[in-house]
Design a protein with these regions (language model features):
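A conserved regulatory-domain signal marking ACT and ACT-like small-molecule sensing domains
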Residues: 2-10, 36, 41-138
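Short beta-strand-centered segments at strand-helix junctions
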Residues: 9-42
Length: 138
């Protein structure tokens, strides 16, 4: 397989077979330079995103929002700043799925200056938050 290197991007078609691994071109793997990738499926858009990562210690933070206010993002930003959570691999931002409103992000917890439990507790205190899920991605 020849990879087009002329422009800003390269593309290949990958074949999906249920229950079978997806194989990436050797040139892609070499250029990425990492041994693992965080793969995210965005349900609404049916889009998969792949992020090369150096660590497999990655957490999902999902906040279910029952009442989205103008202050939600400000309070979320304060909680992230207090925890020193700034290096986020991917975020949905605030989005709807059906009747529910969510904020989701994926991050490496090594950057935090608080425990995961402390981060979770601070997020639960934000007005309008009905549920917080914080778990390691497998």
């Amino acid at each position: 397989m020849v990879i087009d290197r002329e422009g800003a991007t390269s593309a290949v078609i990958l074949r999906f077979t249920a229950g079978k691994p997806v194989e990436f071109p050797a040139e892609f793997v070499k250029e990425i330079g990492e041994k693992a990738g965080l793969t995210i499926l965005h349900h609404k858009d049916r889009v998969m995103k792949l992020f090369p990562v150096a660590s497999d210690n990655i957490y999902l933070l999902r906040i279910e929002i029952s009442d989205l206010s103008r202050n939600f993002l400000k309070q979320l930003n304060y909680a992230f700043n207090d925890a020193k959570l700034s290096d986020i691999i991917f975020t949905t931002g605030v989005c709807l799925r059906g009747e529910k409103c969510y904020y989701e992000c994926y991050f490496v917890p090594d950057q935090l200056v608080v425990s995961l439990d402390e981060l979770e507790d601070s997020l639960k205190m934000i007005d309008g938050v009905s549920r917080v899920v914080l778990r390691k991605v497998e």
